[in-house]
């Protein structure tokens, strides 16, 4: 891995974020930023995203998540920085 691929974050989003294309929105933004990881719906109605890559691009993704896609309502987006593990090759939507 390159020296810039050295950040990992977990992003938890609350609000009207399920049933509005939120995970597909995140997938598209993450792929545009060349980030790896996954996004998934949680049973409590939240969307969780775990992402690795360049910190600047993770911050770009976080800002996009705070805005959300049309039809969504983001009430809260929490980001937690973690040590990168390097165990993702692509970005995917987990069921």
Swiss-Prot record:
It catalyses: an acyl phosphate + H2O = a carboxylate + phosphate + H(+). Keywords: Hydrolase. Its EC number is 3.6.1.7. One of its GO terms (molecular function) is acylphosphatase activity. The active site is at residues 23, 41. Residues 8-95 form the Acylphosphatase-like domain. InterPro entries: Acylphosphatase, Acylphosphatase-like_dom, Acylphosphatase-like_dom_sf, Acylphosphatase_CS. It comes from the Bacteria. PANTHER family: ACYLPHOSPHATASE. Belongs to the acylphosphatase family. This is Acylphosphatase. The gene is acyP.
């Amino acid at each position: 891995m390159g020296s810039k691929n050295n950040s990992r974050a977990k992003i938890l989003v609350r609000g009207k974020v399920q049933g509005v294309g939120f995970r597909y929105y995140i997938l598209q933004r993450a792929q545009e930023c060349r980030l790896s990881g996954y996004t998934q719906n949680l049973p409590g109605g939240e969307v969780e995203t775990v992402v690795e890559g360049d910190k600047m691009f993770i911050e770009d993704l976080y800002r996009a998540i705070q805005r959300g896609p049309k039809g969504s309502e983001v009430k809260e987006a929490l980001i937690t920085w973690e040590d990168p593990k390097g165990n993702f090759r692509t970005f995917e939507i987990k069921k």
